[in-house]
């Protein structure tokens, strides 16, 4: 990877935006970080650079919310997210970068539309649904592995449960901490070895 002016114009702002978003100040601006980095590097390399930042920030966040989470919800969504991650790791090389971005974009649009069209009264919490939790968390694991963008399907399942704010935030943090740790060996699996890199040259 060549480090030049384009690298600093695209990668450095992308990492800064990701840091701001993880601090809670930037909302969903982190969604543009990975696409911005792919201007100058392959997608899997961009994912590998972002992942340690995610894990480091997770450590701090988990410590803060270590007593505020819904264990019952996590028991459902973490295993299915792991399944989605494994599927993503085995199919990752078969998708082009543009196709992956398109898939995640379409999923985000559909999930957002579903939430706003079918949401119930804010005072009525939805019941935990095994099938919905399994589907949403599996897709969250897949999209999180492919482009670090699993927030939308996760929110689609968690928000209707109307948890207390601290419990919702803590559950979400613990969930993505587990997801990021599971992604680490899977991302190493999909990364080209030094021998492959030399042969590619």
Question: For each predicted feature, which ranges?
Answer:
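Transmembrane alpha-helices of multi-pass small-molecule transport proteins
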Residues: 43-64, 177-178
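Hydrophobic alpha-helical transmembrane segments of multi-pass integral membrane proteins
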Residues: 167-187
């Amino acid at each position: 990877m060549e480090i030049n002016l384009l690298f600093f114009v695209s990668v450095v702002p992308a990492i800064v935006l990701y840091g701001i978003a993880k601090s809670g100040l930037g909302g969903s601006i982190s969604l543009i970080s990975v696409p911005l980095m792919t201007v100058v590097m392959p997608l899997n390399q961009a994912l590998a650079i972002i992942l340690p930042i995610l894990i480091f920030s997770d450590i701090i966040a988990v410590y803060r919310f270590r007593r505020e989470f819904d264990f019952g919800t996590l028991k459902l969504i973490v295993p299915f997210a792991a399944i989605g991650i494994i599927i993503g790791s085995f199919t990752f090389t078969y998708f082009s970068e543009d196709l992956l971005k398109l898939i995640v974009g379409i999923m985000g649009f559909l999930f957002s539309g579903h939430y706003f069209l079918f949401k119930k009264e804010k005072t009525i919490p939805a019941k935990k649904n095994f099938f919905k939790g399994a589907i949403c968390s599996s897709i969250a694991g897949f999209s999180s592995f492919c482009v670090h963008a699993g927030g939308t399907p996760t929110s689609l399942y968690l928000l209707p449960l109307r948890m207390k704010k601290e419990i919702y935030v803590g559950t979400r943090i613990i969930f993505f901490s587990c997801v990021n740790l599971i992604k680490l060996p899977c991302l190493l699996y999909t990364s080209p070895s030094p021998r492959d890199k030399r042969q590619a040259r």
